[in-house]
Amino acid sequence: MLKKKRFLFVFLAAASLFTLCACGAPSSQNSEPDLTSETPSSEEPSSTSETSAPESWLDALSSEPFAIFDFSEGKDMYGDKSINIIGDSISQGLNSDLFYDYSWAALFKEAIAKKYGTHNIGYVSLLDRTNEAVPGREIHTISFPQGEWERYYVSGNTPGGMSYATHQQGSALRIEVNRQEGGKDRHINGFYVYYPEGPYRSTITVQVNGQELAVINANRAEENGCARSEYIALPENCPDDMQIDLIAGDCTDKSVIVSGISYIENPNELIVNNYSLSGIQLVNIADDALQKMCRANVVILTLGTNDAGMGADIGLFNSKLDRVKYACQENGSLLIIGNMIWDRADDPDYASVYKNALRNAADEAGGYYLDFNFARIRSDKFLEASRPWDVHPTVIGHDLIAQVLCEYLENQE
């Protein structure tokens, strides 16, 4: 059973404001509305008159690593070699139908697999589905076969921005995933569980198809919203259809919170984590979580659409960008900021203060800035014409974003 819960700083918009937001409607489990430098930064990526099919441009992509990426050592908060994507619903994949195949982030992972030989799916949000208004879903489904769970949405203090919590011993959160989803090998040999730890947290028993594989002790003296389990390998002969049950331990004066899962082929290889969440704003994210997500070899930040649409305080917006900038500089992370605030023909100055802030942050961090309006102008099918309020790219739009990003990276030295 699922109870609904929100933090106070999540704002609900009227329908007129919804047109400005990169957000999707919530999963069916929760019916309330959600809102969602060497810098060649001004250089327009090369454009083509025709839209290439995904297999076309991916096939044409060189297998040579991107020259500006350095994976000689792991730099993320867990010691992994990683690329962390931090965005909203556009980057989570809304309107791409199958997030894990057709979103720009999924296509970018295909490019990374070609160049680096790694097929790790990485972090996947527990916000698994949207409604029919803006279609799409994650690779797994979430259910609650036992006990009561509360959803903390856009909570901001965990990687990925949302979590489920229970105060009942024996409560179970179930994650169902098929290792051959859609008839394609998903390269899932194991996984990590994300959870907050602290003095008021309990244990989490991890079962796969009824077999206990691990017990996570989240009870620690100090709070850490970004804890992650040890790698949990699947047993031999594990069936393709998997039920991962996360079962709460003793909750006397304690709770269990689960904030995500990461599907892994090889834990020693590069991981692309997509920490994007429908409805989130940059100003929603707690400083500690933001700084920790910026600990990676490469950080791709695509936030700003919801901040602009909801009129987020520009001072706070710039303060959060400063956190991103300083965290990347301190950690030696390469920062790429992608602008996904779409231009408006009837309002050329729309959201210019936010766009300028994004560009300036990339410049000041010695990173890269890429305006994805350059992808939008390649096709009149980039957005859904039948939904003029919808800022989420179509499958064609997602493909163009990934294509423009990879072309851009190929041309950097």
What are these language model-derived features?
Residues 1-11:
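Bacterial N-terminal signal peptides that target proteins for export
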Residues 19-22:
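C-terminal motif of bacterial Sec signal peptides marking the signal peptidase cleavage site
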Residues 27-79:
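N-terminal, intrinsically disordered, polar/charged segments of Gram-positive cell-envelope systems
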Residues 64-73, 282-292, 315-324, 353-356:
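Alpha-helical scaffolding within the catalytic cores
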Residues 79-82, 116-117, 268-271, 295-300, ...:
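Loop/turn elements at helix/coil->beta-strand transitions in domains of secreted/extracellular proteins
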Residues 90-207, 212-316, 392:
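Conserved SGNH/GDSL esterase-like catalytic core that processes O-acyl groups on lipids
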Residues 300-309, 324-355:
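Active-site segments of SGNH/GDSL-like serine hydrolases
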Residues 309, 342-413:
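Catalytic His-Asp segment of secreted/periplasmic serine-dependent ester chemistry enzymes
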